Amino acid sequence: MSLVIRNLQRVIPIRRAPLRSKIEIVRRILGVQKFDLGIICVDNKNIQHINRIYRDRNVPTDVLSFPFHEHLKAGEFPQPDFPDDYNLGDIFLGVEYIFHQCKENEDYNDVLTVTATHGLCHLLGFTHGTEAEWQQMFQKEKAVLDELGRRTGTRLQPLTRGLFGGS
């Protein structure tokens, strides 16, 4: 099914073709390529607004995920009853926030891929509110990014590394 990437900001340049290519591979690795997915790139002002409305946090952030199929357990696949239900949901990337959070020698486009992968894991029910949930999500992200690396030659680390003292 389709992957739609929308760039609704003009602060940070987005290279959509490489991002699309890597996210398509991530979708295949996760086994969810038959589901629609929306990725929306926004600036700090808009990600902060969305974060305030939906999470009651009045600060910009890197990623917000809005699953079409709520209440999935970690790693569970949606079981659509109708063709229109083949939708994972939407991921909002705070690209301005992500750009400014990049460390020296980090490739911004790689960090976008990692952040989108993190958002995809959230759409599949993964969370990181507790150490056990974090460990499960970290392992999933790591496995996906390692496989992406085998297929593309990139070496990427999960977004959640270090959240609970992990490496």
Swiss-Prot record:
Domain of life: Eukaryota
Cofactor note: Binds 1 zinc ion.
InterPro entries: MetalPrtase_cat_dom_sf_prd (IPR023091), YbeY (IPR002036), YbeY_CS (IPR020549)
Chain residues that bind Zn(2+): H118, H122, H128
PROSITE patterns on file: UPF0054
Keywords: Endonuclease, Hydrolase, Metal-binding, Nuclease, Nucleus, Zinc
Enzyme Commission number, as recorded: 3.1.-.-
UniProt subcellular location: Nucleus
Enzyme category, top tier: hydrolase
Residues of the signal peptide: none
Keyword Coiled coil: no
Annotated SUPFAM superfamilies: Metalloproteases ('zincins'), catalytic domain
Pfam families: YbeY (PF02130)
GO cellular component, one term: nucleus
A single GO molecular function term of this UniProt record: RNA endonuclease activity
Other facts: A protein of the expected size has been detected by antibody binding and Western blot in at least one of the analyzed tissues or cells.
NCBIfam families per the UniProt record, alphabetical: rRNA maturation RNase YbeY (TIGR00043)
PANTHER family: ENDORIBONUCLEASE YBEY, CHLOROPLASTIC
HAMAP family, per database record: Endoribonucl_YbeY
Family: Belongs to the endoribonuclease YbeY family.
Function comment: Single strand-specific metallo-endoribonuclease involved in rRNA maturation.
Record protein name field: Endoribonuclease YbeY
